[in-house]
């Protein structure tokens, strides 16, 4: 890490980011049609209202929308066993992220015969035997699927999964026996509708355990309206972790431990950002907090690469392909341009002979953060006292309270399946 000696973590009280969210305002199922969701537009402290079907009306031509194309995996696996008393005991394994041996995530999803993941286990005390076994059928072939506990650290387990078929992938296994992991505040089992509607229409990169929900509103018709206006569409990947639902339990945000997530950015997008960021009338619009955190993280990873070069060191170490929770603030004294930072990353990728930046980010965007790449954010309405709400406060200041009060008073639906908003930034 590159520490700034004058850096102090923000000590904002999380209580200042609380509001009353009645259960009746939470969306427990999606709107009938994706683009029917309501859209609140915030620009220079003025609130406007529309629907996602008309979102192109609020975005200028030649703007760039950047989407997260991560796909939610069926990460919940149930093992059921009937004991001698004829009582069914259920053990649920919730796959969080693959162990280091099986990263990037694509490698874990395409693994054959064996793979290991960091997992949560529901009913862990019921797990008495060494190995859990489940039978399944894929392509008319009977397969035995095994789960074995390897280790436990801080309430999470390392689970080794294995199966007795040489060509079936872990992705195929999950598609048959796994369940879509709905957010914890949706207190129901996932159904057939969720398999479609808790995915964006453009999701292709398997690995998330929660949907990048800002994109759920974008239907084919919405994409067509964006294209008609020459609004450019680009894609990156952040695999959303279960930590996205973790409330900030500490009294002040500096005491919160931000979760880390994998990001993947193609070299073509880095080239594009280098040439098209900071240009008047060509704003960069992040679709979702995950896209925003990824884009901003790419800038700071470029800063780290530049600092490394200034020290005349040959290669950026592997552990520096991770952005720590507060590193963006520690590095803020370095005022490199977008072109400089993107060039540094391009040089790094070219030196490695790779077409994709794969890294981890813990970036925590809070009030006081200076946005480097993004000009606007499209996002849903977030939980009280959450790190996602802190991002809204970083954009709007105390105006978030006015925005959320307006949404509550005007029957907007909140959280993952709810309505959304478009925030324009004027504090760059």
Model-predicted segments: where are they?
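Surface-exposed, charge/polar-rich loops and edge strands
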Residues: 2-428
């Amino acid at each position: 890490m590159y520490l700034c000696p004058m850096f102090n973590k923000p000590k904002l009280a999380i209580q200042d980011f609380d509001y009353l969210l009645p259960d009746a305002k939470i969306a427990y199922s999606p709107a009938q049609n994706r683009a029917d969701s309501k859209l609140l537009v915030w620009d220079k402290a003025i609130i406007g209202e529309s629907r996602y079907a008309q979102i192109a009306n609020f975005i200028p031509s030649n703007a760039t929308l950047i989407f997260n194309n991560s796909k939610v995996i069926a990460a919940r696996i149930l093992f059921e066993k009937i004991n001698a008393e004829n009582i069914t005991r259920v053990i649920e394994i919730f796959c969080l992220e693959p162990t280091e041996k099986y990263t990037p995530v694509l490698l874990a999803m395409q693994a054959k015969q064996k793979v290991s993941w960091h997992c949560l286990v529901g009913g862990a005390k019921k797990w008495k035997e060494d190995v859990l076994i489940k039978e399944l059928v894929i392509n008319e072939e009977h397969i035995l699927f095994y789960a074995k506990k390897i280790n436990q650290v801080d309430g999470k387990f390392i689970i080794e999964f294995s199966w007795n078929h040489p060509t079936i992938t872990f992705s195929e296994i999950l598609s048959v026996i796994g369940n879509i992991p709905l957010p914890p505040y949706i207190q129901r089992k996932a159904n057939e509708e969720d398999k479609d509607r808790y995915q964006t229409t453009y999701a292709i990169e398997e690995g998330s355990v929660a949907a990048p929900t800002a994109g759920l509103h974008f239907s084919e018709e919405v994409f067509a309206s964006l294209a008609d206006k020459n609004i450019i569409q680009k894609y990156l990947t952040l695999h959303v972790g279960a930590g996205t639902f973790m409330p900030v339990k500490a009294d002040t945000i500096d005491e919160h431990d931000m979760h880390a997530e994998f990001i993947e950015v193609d070299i073509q997008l880095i080239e594009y950002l280098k040439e098209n960021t900071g240009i008047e009338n060509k704003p960069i619009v992040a679709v979702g907090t995950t896209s925003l955190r990824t884009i901003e993280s790419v800038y700071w990873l470029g800063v780290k690469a530049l600092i490394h070069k200034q020290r005349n060191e040959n290669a950026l170490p592997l552990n520096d392909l991770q952005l720590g929770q507060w590193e963006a603030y520690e590095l803020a004294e370095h005022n490199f341009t977008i072109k400089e930072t993107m060039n540094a990353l391009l040089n790094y990728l070219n030196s490695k002979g790779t077409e994709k930046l794969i890294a981890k980010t813990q970036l925590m965007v809070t009030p006081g953060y200076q946005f480097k790449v993004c000009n606007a954010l499209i996002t849903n309405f977030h939980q009280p006292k959450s790190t996602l709400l802190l991002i809204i406060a970083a954009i709007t200041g105390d105006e978030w309270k006015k925005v959320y009060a307006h949404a509550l008073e005007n029957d907007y639906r909140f959280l993952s399946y709810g309505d959304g908003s478009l925030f324009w930034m004027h504090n760059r």
